[in-house]
Structure formats: structure tokens, C-alpha cells
From Swiss-Prot:
<feature type="binding site">
    <location>
        <position position="195"/>
    </location>
    <ligand>
        <name>pyridoxal 5'-phosphate</name>
    </ligand>
</feature>
<feature type="binding site">
    <location>
        <begin position="76"/>
        <end position="77"/>
    </location>
    <ligand>
        <name>pyridoxal 5'-phosphate</name>
    </ligand>
</feature>
<feature type="modified residue" description="N6-(pyridoxal phosphate)lysine">
    <location>
        <position position="196"/>
    </location>
</feature>
<dbReference type="GO" id="GO:0030170">
    <property type="term" value="F:pyridoxal phosphate binding"/>
</dbReference>
<feature type="binding site">
    <location>
        <position position="153"/>
    </location>
    <ligand>
        <name>pyridoxal 5'-phosphate</name>
    </ligand>
</feature>
<comment type="subunit">
    <text>Homodimer.</text>
</comment>
<dbReference type="GO" id="GO:0008615">
    <property type="term" value="P:pyridoxine biosynthetic process"/>
</dbReference>
<dbReference type="GO" id="GO:0004648">
    <property type="term" value="F:O-phospho-L-serine:2-oxoglutarate aminotransferase activity"/>
</dbReference>
<dbReference type="GO" id="GO:0006564">
    <property type="term" value="P:L-serine biosynthetic process"/>
</dbReference>
<comment type="pathway">
    <text>Cofactor biosynthesis; pyridoxine 5'-phosphate biosynthesis; pyridoxine 5'-phosphate from D-erythrose 4-phosphate: step 3/5.</text>
</comment>
<feature type="binding site">
    <location>
        <position position="102"/>
    </location>
    <ligand>
        <name>pyridoxal 5'-phosphate</name>
    </ligand>
</feature>
<keyword id="KW-0028">Amino-acid biosynthesis</keyword>
<comment type="function">
    <text>Catalyzes the reversible conversion of 3-phosphohydroxypyruvate to phosphoserine and of 3-hydroxy-2-oxo-4-phosphonooxybutanoate to phosphohydroxythreonine.</text>
</comment>
<dbReference type="InterPro" id="IPR000192">
    <property type="entry name" value="Aminotrans_V_dom"/>
</dbReference>
<dbReference type="InterPro" id="IPR022278">
    <property type="entry name" value="Pser_aminoTfrase"/>
</dbReference>
<dbReference type="InterPro" id="IPR020578">
    <property type="entry name" value="Aminotrans_V_PyrdxlP_BS"/>
</dbReference>
<dbReference type="GO" id="GO:0005737">
    <property type="term" value="C:cytoplasm"/>
</dbReference>
Length: 360
């Protein structure tokens, strides 16, 4: 079988080593004679999976003991609603930093529950898309929390700093979680859809500080109430067990590779390889300022956009899949999450070089 590299923004690549292990034990997991998909979420076998996966995630992220880890349904869009319903308390506003498509989507959802202070933090620097430094963000005094999306997957824009504030910081880390070390103690809530760096779609991770529990609005659906989910240990209803199990296998894989510092070095090398090639080319362009380029999602444009379809068709034939940019911005996009090996990025660069030579 021809080697295929999947550059999809999500659902994204899952580590080949993990997929192989899952395949081998799919129909007879742990000698039970059944699949892990078929066992009760309350069985001792699955409870052991749940306990170990949380333990491994806590170790990877160095999560302090005063934070709870939840394994939920609903994706990041579910959290767009859950966050204000859980954290507003008696307040009627929260600060929402608008850095792109996903932040804007969170703001639109928040308007159902409060009057968000939406702050446009985008700017232009040296003719490129950029983000204002966090010290220049306009925060309000009466906000219940500060929400932002550190990595906008569509535009390929990443925010690298945090604001100085005494309000809880809430971050949508769907596309960057586990890609490098972070200081969890600087956040009030972290949430992430699983389908980029954690595992298959259907699972959502929420990390919430203990003092933020108990503020939920009375009308909040129980399935979104952080306090209920903490009390029930993420098993208020049947959780996405297969996605949870597979996430646990990804956590083990990350630990075997050396943890998040090792993953950071791996991801830095991939991004450097791709961006250096684009910057050295007169045929391709990236329109994001170097200070805010995403390490996970690298959009690029051909100087001859009429060749886009040809590029995508030939790339696909070469085993380089899902490189089409988001419909909002067009062009191309290479999502190079944790599971993408540097060999995949090298294969992409080699193809891009050959395509340029033939079509410049």
C-alpha cells in the first residue's frame, strides 16, 4: 500500500503505532473476547481505562490537584454554550477575544446567555495577518471571565501570550493541546475537542479549576453542568467509551515519546521545515506574520491560484491528502498535528518543490 499522509484539519491523523495496537486488540480486548466498544462504561475493566487515561493526561500536562478533568460529549461547540452557562454566575458579561473564525463562533453562542464584550484582537503587521499583544487587549472590569482561542485553524494564526488579569482565563485548546508544555495553573478552564491531537471525534476534554464549580445557571442542561460531571466522574450518562479508550492510548504514546517537551521539539522541527521552504519560494506564500504563525496549521497560497485544483489533484495522487484550505479562505492548508511525522512534512515539501519546478 502506498504511504499516505493525512493533512486534514480534523478529524486528523492518529499515530500509526496507536492505530496498529487498536487494530490488533479490537475484537478481543484484554482477553475478554469482546471489543472495548462493547463493554459497560461502569465495568471494572473500563473504569480502569478511565482512571489510567486521566492519570496519564494529568502527568503529561502537569495538571494541579485543584483542577478536575472531564471527559465529555459535545465538542468545542458544546463548550461554547457550556462555558457561559457554567461560569457567568450573577454576571451578565464576559470578555471574548476575537482572533478569528472559531473565537467569533464562540462569541455568537455566548450572546444567547450574556452580553459578551467582543474585542477584535486581529491586526496587520508588515503586510501580514497578526494578533495584538495580550497587553493591548481591552479587558473590562465586570467580566466574569476572559475567553480566547489560542490557535485559529482556518487562518493559521496562533496566540503565544496570555493577558495579565485576575479573571479566570478560558481557552479553546482544541488544536494545540498536548503539542507543547503549558502552565495549566494560569487558566480557569481549558477545553478541547479530541479530533486533532487527542483521538477520534466524539470526545471533549474539559479541565476546570475547583473554585469555578457551583456557579452554573439553574436552567443549564445537566449534561453540560461541570459540577454534575465532576460529581459523577464524567459518567452522568454513557460517555464516548471508544474515543476515551483511544485517547488513553494516545496519552501512553506521548509518554513513550518523552512527553510534551519532546513533542514540542518534534512539532517545532516540522513547522520550521515547512515554513522555511515556503519563505524561500517565489511560488508559494503564507500570509501570516511570523510572530503569529501556527505550529499546527500552516495555510499557504500559490502565486498562481489558477493552479490550485491541479496542485490538490496531483498532491492527492502522491498520497498527500486533505490539503485543500478551508472554504472561508481558500488556498491550501497543511495541518501538522502531533501524529504527523516529520517524514510526512518532508514528503509535502518535496512535492511542493517538484510542482513549482514544473509550473513556475
Amino acid at each position: 500500500m502506498e504511504k499516505v499522509y493525512n493533512f486534514c484539519a480534523g478529524p486528523a491523523m492518529i499515530p500509526a503505532e496507536v492505530l496498529k495496537k487498536v487494530q490488533e486488540e479490537l475484537v478481543n480486548w484484554n482477553g475478554l473476547g469482546t471489543s472495548v466498544m462493547e463493554i459497560s462504561h461502569r465495568s471494572k475493566e473500563f473504569l480502569a481505562v478511565a482512571k489510567q487515561s486521566e492519570k496519564d493526561l494529568r502527568e503529561l500536562l502537569s495538571i494541579p490537584s485543584n483542577y478536575h478533568v472531564l471527559f465529555c460529549h459535545g465538542g468545542a461547540r458544546g463548550q461554547f454554550a457550556a462555558v457561559p452557562m457554567n461560569l457567568l454566575g450573577d454576571a451578565n458579561t464576559a470578555d471574548y477575544m476575537d482572533g478569528g473564525y472559531w473565537a467569533h463562533s464562540a462569541i455568537a453562542e455566548a450572546k444567547k446567555y450574556c452580553s459578551p464584550n467582543a474585542v477584535d484582537i486581529t491586526c496587520e503587521r508588515e503586510g501580514k495577518k497578526a494578533i495584538l499583544p495580550a497587553r493591548e487587549w481591552s479587558l473590562s472590569d465586570d467580566a466574569a471571565f476572559v475567553h480566547f482561542c489560542p490557535n485559529e485553524t482556518i487562518d493559521g494564526i496562533e496566540i503565544r501570550d496570555l493577558p495579565e488579569t485576575d479573571k479566570p482565563i478560558v481557552a479553546d485548546l482544541s488544536s494545540t493541546i498536548l503539542s507543547r508544555p503549558i502552565d495549566v495553573s494560569k487558566y480557569g478552564v481549558i477545553y478541547a475537542g479530541a479530533q486533532k491531537n487527542i483521538g477520534p471525534a466524539g470526545l471533549t476534554i474539559v479541565i476546570v479549576r475547583d473554585d469555578l464549580l457551583g456557579k452554573a445557571k439553574q436552567e443549564i442542561p445537566s449534561i453540560f453542568d461541570y459540577t454534575v460531571l465532576v460529581d459523577k466522574e464524567s459518567m452522568f450518562n454513557t460517555p464516548p467509551t471508544f474515543a476515551w479508550y483511544l485517547a488513553g492510548e494516545v496519552f501512553k504514546w506521548l509518554k513513550e515519546l518523552g512527553g510534551l517537551e519532546a513533542m514540542k521539539q518534534r512539532n517545532d522541527a516540522k513547522a520550521e521545515l515547512l515554513y522555511n521552504f515556503i519563505d524561500g519560494s517565489n511560488f508559494y506564500n503564507n500570509d501570516v506574520h511570523v510572530d503569529n504563525r501556527s505550529f499546527m496549521n500552516a495555510p499557504f497560497q500559490l502565486k498562481k491560484p489558477e493552479l490550485d485544483s491541479k496542485f490538490l489533484e496531483q498532491a492527492d495522487a502522491a498520497g498527500l491528502k486533505a490539503l485543500k484550505g478551508h472554504r472561508v479562505v481558500g488556498g491550501m492548508r497543511a495541518s501538522i498535528y502531533n501524529a504527523m511525522p516529520i517524514e510526512g512534512v518532508q514528503a509535502l515539501v518535496d512535492f511542493m518543490r517538484q510542482f513549482e519546478q514544473k509550473n513556475a
